[in-house]
UniProtKB/Swiss-Prot annotation:
It comes from the Bacteria. The gene is lgt. The keyword Metal-binding does not apply. Catalyzes the transfer of the diacylglyceryl group from phosphatidylglycerol to the sulfhydryl group of the N-terminal cysteine of a prolipoprotein, the first step in the formation of mature lipoproteins. GO terms for cellular component: plasma membrane. GO terms for molecular function: phosphatidylglycerol-prolipoprotein diacylglyceryl transferase activity. InterPro entries: Lgt (IPR001640). Its EC number is 2.5.1.145. It comes from Gluconacetobacter diazotrophicus (strain ATCC 49037 / DSM 5601 / CCUG 37298 / CIP 103539 / LMG 7603 / PAl5). This is Phosphatidylglycerol--prolipoprotein diacylglyceryl transferase. It is found in: Cell inner membrane. It is a multi-pass membrane protein. It holds the Pfam family LGT.
């Protein structure tokens, strides 16, 4: 029998600077937003141009608010509504954790809708470019989850070479499901999105990339949920499903619908007048 790996006890705090504390999870968010901002700046310049660089810069604030507020509200509503209804002020205690990707996704969708309406942009065209970089942020977030020793997997056979004992989860070896998600929802999905986004014919069909992301994430998350331990306060749902899988069903349906609609509509080669790559 192979020796079982023991989860290394990482310090959840990345660095102390006087009274300032920067945690790995916060750094994952910051890195994802900043790198994503630079990549979206590049993507919107590809023909047909979807926005100006200045508009992408402005959207960074909207995206940050959408992710943080949506992620927090989603966690409260989807996972622990009774707890926060009884203790509403606990919703402000974000340092205790509790963020939902599905809530964050809804928050960003609202931010995209308001921002594109206010700036006279194509909602689907701009959303296509933004969703390409989202998996990168997901991957970084799951790595931060692993460093924090949270969201571990279900029990795994000790013969599995990468089975790992998480001290907070008991003595059983488990799947490091955070790393599965970082790989599938992060690296693999980002690679697929980036490759497809490079095709001009796809960029001329607004909504296809956004639909591909929704469907791709739903599939990747549903697979990873088969190895992830359900939240203790929810457990398994009917037919052995999890809350994460249930929330992925409407995402998958919406994704297929967007892709089908994009392919049935005539290609739209111009979303806004072409601008030089260095134009604001």
């Amino acid at each position: 029998m192979l020796p079982v790996l023991i989860f290394p006890q990482f310090d959840p705090v990345m660095v102390h600077v006087g009274p300032l504390v920067i945690r790995w999870y916060a750094m994952a968010y910051i890195t994802a937003l900043l790198v994503g901002w630079r990549l979206v700046r590049h993507l919107v310049r590809l023909a047909p141009r979807a926005a100006t660089d200045v508009q992408v810069d402005d959207f960074l604030t909207w995206a940050t608010l959408g992710v943080v507020l949506g992620g927090r509200l989603g966690y409260i509503l989807f996972y622990q509504p009774a707890v926060y209804l009884a203790h509403p002020l606990a919703a402000l205690q974000v340092w205790h954790g509790g963020m939902s990707f599905h809530g964050g996704a809804l928050g960003v969708i609202v931010a995209l809708a308001l921002f594109t309406w206010r700036n006279g942009l194509s909602f689907l065209g701009f959303s296509d470019r933004v969703t390409v970089v989202v998996p990168m942020g997901l991957g970084l977030g799951r790595i931060a989850n692993f460093i924090n020793g949270e969201l571990w997997g279900r029990p795994a056979p000790a013969s599995l070479p990468w089975a790992m004992v998480f001290p907070q989860a008991g003595p059983e070896p488990r799947h490091p499901s955070e790393l599965y998600e970082a790989l599938l929802e992060g690296l693999v999905l980002f690679s697929v999105m980036w490759i497809v986004a490079r095709r001009p014919a796809i960029r001329e069909r607004p909504g296809f990339l956004a639909g591909l992301f929704l469907f791709g994430y739903a599939v990747a998350r549903s697979i990873c949920e088969c190895f992830r331990e359900p939240d203790a306060f929810i457990g398994f749902l009917p037919f052995g499903t999890t809350m994460g899988q249930i929330l992925c069903i409407p995402m998958a349906i919406a994704g297929v619908g967007l892709m089908a609609q994009a392919m049935m509509r005539p290609a739209r080669p111009v979303l806004m007048p072409a601008l030089p790559a260095d134009s604001p």
